[in-house]
Amino acid sequence: MVTLNASSPLTTKSFLPYRHAPRRPISFSPVFAVHSTDPKKSTQSASASVKWSLESWKSKKALQLPDYPDQKDVDSVLQTLSSFPPIVFAGEARKLEDKLGQAAMGQAFMLQGGDCAESFKEFNANNIRDTFRVLLQMGVVLMFGGQLPVIKVGRMAGQFAKPRSDPFEEKDGVKLPSYRGDNINGDAFDEKSRIPDPHRMVRAYTQSVATLNLLRAFATGGYAAMQRVSQWNLDFTQHSEQGDRYRELANRVDEALGFMGAAGLTSAHPIMTTTEFWTSHECLLLPYEQALTREDSTSGLYYDCSAHMLWVGERTRQLDGAHVEFLRGIANPLGIKVSDKMVPSELVKLIEILNPQNKPGRITVIVRMGAENMRVKLPNLIRAVRGAGQIVTWVSDPMHGNTIMAPGGLKTRSFDAIRAELRAFFDVHDQEGSFPGGVHLEMTGQNVTECVGGSRTITYNDLSSRYHTHCDPRLNASQSLELAFIIAERLRKRRLGSGNLPSSIGV
């Protein structure tokens, strides 16, 4: 969490005495499978019977990890990382878990967004500020429409590593290892760039620290004050339909603040001058995550201090796999990415492994499966989880199930398909009597042309003009804000008790 004020749960005690892992040399020993990788053959009791440790994941089969050429170099880098200060604090992660527990009960809504993959080359203050600013705008829109607290979580300050469906990439007859994210190897298509370099982990750490430092300054230094709500519009959205709608909403907020001032209610309260902001990323590069895991002296629990929240991806969520083994032992709030391939009983077992105490806010299920599959598959998942008595926060990721190849060869996503999946997500929760707890978006504050559609009608022919992503296509600022208004309208309908009625506009 970014805000640090008098109401923060971070005492002096929780700042200082993190207990680091024992100071023996970190060994990135080869990992191997001791159980079948078939999720259906694993059970919660089998996993729970094995004592967890920082290195217990190494006894499991680990997918999506790079093959480093020099093991001694890797060990040296990991030892250095293990001596570095934590990027985030345990008390912040606990507070996020409490907030997500509210979202699980329909009392809050999570807005999670940011880059598909952060890069070293595009790292600068303006890009960080612009993405943060769009998230602030979206948060205001959602809060105003839903009359709910909005939990703002960035895919920032650590979202580097990316899973790959193929370990190799081929161009013009040349076959090289796939690009796996800037914290592992380079994206340039040459042999040297594609060799995994452990020193990139150190650079990823320093960039994450610098990013979070800037976010903390923006969140607490007055930039995020509600009184600035009308000043957050980006230049290229000001003269658009979404810019006009946002300006109208901002004026209404300004009027409300003016009324509060006239009534003698102070606007100097921290809730009006600062914002809470958390960070998250996919837990993929396990050696890095282990090196940044600390034992919290106030609770005795282990926290992965690389981010407030981590999630396990579709390709690494095997019940008996290394990633699930690592995550079950850390106390951070966790996300589970779920596609149409997820079997209800498997999801229940995975939640049992990761949250045996059934703590609200511990597990967020991030659903990504396309609109048609959403209507067929999600009800069964909700019923299975409810039948098991498990408490989770349901979140829609309308991005990953809607990636297509444009005629020109660029990956893209259709705004209409994204909206359709969100509509299906809300419809299913209305039907099942459950709570839509949030949205997870790949987006940027930059004026890119990577997703087609939206009110500005980006076409296939427009894609190449400002296509800057290192990985998957992202919503630009205008499209992100447009989506926020659509979601806010649906939240408003739920608030007014008419969420089950068909909508003529929006979702």
From Swiss-Prot:
Q: What is its EC number?
A: 2.5.1.54
Q: Which GO terms describe its cellular component?
A: chloroplast; chloroplast thylakoid; plasma membrane
Where is this gene product found? Plastid, Chloroplast
Lineage top rank: taxon = Eukaryota
**GO molecular function, one example?**
3-deoxy-7-phosphoheptulonate synthase activity
Supply the name of the protein.
Phospho-2-dehydro-3-deoxyheptonate aldolase 2, chloroplastic
Location, primary (coarse class): plastid
Say which species the protein is native to: Arabidopsis thaliana
Pathway, per UniProt?
Answer: Metabolic intermediate biosynthesis; chorismate biosynthesis; chorismate from D-erythrose 4-phosphate and phosphoenolpyruvate: step 1/7
Task: Provide the catalytic activity annotation.
Answer: D-erythrose 4-phosphate + phosphoenolpyruvate + H2O = 7-phospho-2-dehydro-3-deoxy-D-arabino-heptonate + phosphate
- What family does this chain come from, according to its entry? Belongs to the class-II DAHP synthase family.
The entry's keywords? Amino-acid biosynthesis, Aromatic amino acid biosynthesis, Chloroplast, Plastid, Transferase, Transit peptide
Q: Which GO terms describe its biological process?
A: amino acid biosynthetic process; aromatic amino acid family biosynthetic process; chorismate biosynthetic process
